[in-house]
Amino acid sequence: MKKKFYTLLLLTLFFTSISIASSDFSIEEVSRDLIVFSQNGQQGLIVINENNSIVVDPMNQETTKNIQNFLASNGKPMISRIIYSHSHWDRISTGKTTLNKDIAVIAQQECSLYLSTNNKDVLGPTIYFQDYFEITDGRKKIDLYYYGPSHGECMIVIHLVEENLLFIPDLLHTKGASFPRDATLPYLRPSTLINFFNELEKLVQKKKIKSFIGGHKEDKLIGSTSIIAEQKIFWELMQKTAEQAEIDGIINLDNFIDLEQLDLQPYQQYDNYDSEDLINIIRRYTSFLNMGR
């Protein structure tokens, strides 16, 4: 894989004003037609076809301009479609003047609650789908799957069929099962999370998918899909711990667990372990068990 870093000083192509691009914009070529771009710690995809390019999660206006400049300066076709992997604005705020008005924007139906009129910088989807959507363009085929609320209400996984590679925007780390990036878990949906992982495992087995790319920049660009089962075990452990803690009476009135009453060894094996994070995660699960939220 080839890695290229671009410090873009003047972006005059396709834009009405001169912009200065951030020096941390980078691309990494997975294959001739599949490129991972990253900026500010987040990652998305560019899928290049003969006559057009498809972008997954263009992040923001600056990143979108960097992508367009990269395509133009390398003789690549310009963007014709955008796929939103979920509704969080830090991944989809392109600005409405940056892109051609004829661009198709694809998102899962549940995203509509957040994308209707809430953010003027988010280009509204032109296509919504429920559980599955297929994009076929020339020899390229991209499958979009929705397995219910997981990281927010509408996160999807994307199967790049030619490469037999998954793009999973959140909930997984390419280096292995881990504590979450944000232990306050503002977007986690415990009621349907395990079902999400179950369905993801079925997809991987059915399609014989061995590798995935995540939505956050990490030391390893590509991870093994065996991590899916390992991460599911982590979340099952969190729920079982919360359930047992309630039975044992070691949860106080504010839903905080007494860690001194807990054997920490099963949790310390996971990357990014932090005792305070463990307390917050268990609190999230006890809140779910007690209130259904």
Q: Residues of each region from the PLM?
A:
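Bacterial N-terminal signal peptides that target proteins for export
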Residues: 1-9
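Accessory terminal helices/loops
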Residues: 204-211, 218-293
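Boundary at the C-terminal end of the N-terminal hydrophobic targeting segment
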Residues: 19-23
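Metallo-beta-lactamase
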Residues: 24, 28-30, 53, 60, 109-154, 161-162, ...
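Active-site HxH/HxHxD metal-binding segment of metal-dependent hydrolases
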Residues: 65, 69-136
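Bacterial N-terminal signal peptides
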Residues: 8-17
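Conserved beta-strand hairpin/beta-sheet module of binuclear metal-dependent hydrolase folds
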Residues: 25-69, 157-170
